[in-house]
Amino acid sequence: MTRRSFIESTGATYATLMAWGLLKPAPADAFDLPANGRKDGKARKVVILGAGLAGLTTAYELGKLGYDCTVLEARKRSGGRVWTVRGGTKETEIGGSEQTCKFVDGQYFNGGAARIPHNHQLTLHYCRELGVPLEIFNGSNESAWLYNDGGSGALANKRMRIREYHSDLRGYTSELLAKALDQSSLDQQLTKEDVEKLIDFLKNEGDLNTGKLYKGTNRRGYKTPPGAGAVPGDLADPYGLTDYLRSGYMQPVFYNNGDYTFEQHATLLQPVGGMDAIPRAFEKKLAGKIQFNAPVKELRKTENGVRVVYQKDGKPTELTAEFCVCALPLPVLKKLDSDLSPMVKRAADFIPYMKTGKIGLQFKRRFWEEDDAIYGGISRTNMDINQIWYPSFGLLGQKGVLIGYYNFYSRAEAVGDLPLAGREKLALEQGYKLHPQYPQEFENSFSLAWQKIPYNEGGWAVYDDAVRRKYYPALLEPDGNIYLAGEHTTYLTAWMAGAFTSARRVVEALHARVGEYTKK
């Protein structure tokens, strides 16, 4: 077996990457806590609300320490916002919109969490420990499109490759700086030798000519690509600096992209076959511990711990335990009938959640690869669709599913308020401006608005400094024997790493507290 075929057959598993030294183990993430059993030898009971990643991780780690855990999950699946949509997936949104996914076998999109940063070591630790194979997620592609809808001048209503945009703006910026240096306006700060070194850097950074002018180079691509014989290739002409300044292309949506975000620096990863491979791996470790279709109705403190009332087979059922770890999103928690402290209830009421939505579009052929040479990555626009994501799996296949929009805030709210057919229509009409192939190749769609997904009602917690100072501390301390977990109790909101690290924090705190009991 060749090295290439081995990678393809394993999906570039974590073990493979580690064996070749491309990824290193993270021993700091090993969780080694001392056992703190009861003096009577019985396991301490813990009820965990929610089978998202925070709840699953809590049950998994406490289970290893000998606790008797029960996880109550309102849905028939685990994962929470780690949700892979594939053929047969069904969802009824708040408001009654129902849909069933019609994707062909092997096609999917991740409706929630969709990428793993290389620097989220705890997430990678659990993928390693649970045996979840990973592959590359291509989040940055210079061949993807930018499209400026509206504006003025030569670039109004025009799409361009990201590489053209980056090359032109780096070139013109470097040209302006090089000219300023040549005018000796910085002599007081820099020596002559310093100026020469900086100009050399700018000439390389902006790919300037000998006259320190930017005229466009092969960095931005070709009109006609190079070929054999007497075919050197024809360079594409750059757009003018004034064209950029007069257009809408100077908006943050175009230049403030993931390339500048710490968590989105390459390399990014994804589980082979869908992000739900992670919660499914936890499920295998927690066999018999998760009760599905069990929405929680009440949470009460008792003299000896907690009492939880939940629905099972249409009937109210009661469960008591020594401790409760509540891993419900705050929009769900605030509707729960409970005797949580006023501070916790106030935090749940006032900490906002992101409105966000996605749509998966299945096409007959992968025209973005065949026609546009786009293999993974993200196109961006100032329209309501905001982003188009291209799949990093199934390359060179026949059919494909791309994410036709991924939007936030008021745009996500407006699009989410549309009927399902209206969301699809908007995605196709606006996406057509980047990909004219849409009408001919489209087959079906599946959309979701997280603010309308039952048992979530939002994408992730959104903090500003004031909200963080005023409400966040109440989420971090136990309320009697009730602990809170979830990305909303971390500074890693919106990431799976937030769920993981919150669970670890709660397990440590609860276990240390039990240790104090044991000593008495």
Regions found by a protein language model. Name each.
Residues 1-14:
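N-terminal secretory signal peptides and thylakoid transit peptides that target proteins
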Residues 9, 18, 22, 29-33, ...:
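Conserved flavin/dinucleotide-binding core of flavoenzymes
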Residues 34-176:
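N-terminal glycine-rich phosphate/pyrophosphate-binding loop and immediately adjacent elements
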Residues 37-40, 101-108, 253-267, 284, ...:
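Short glycine/proline-rich turn/loop motifs
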Residues 106-117, 264-272, 344-352, 410-421, ...:
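Active-site rim elements
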Residues 143, 150, 174-295, 303-305, ...:
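Active-site/ligand-binding neighborhood in enzyme catalytic cores
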Residues 292-403:
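Mid-domain catalytic core of redox enzymes
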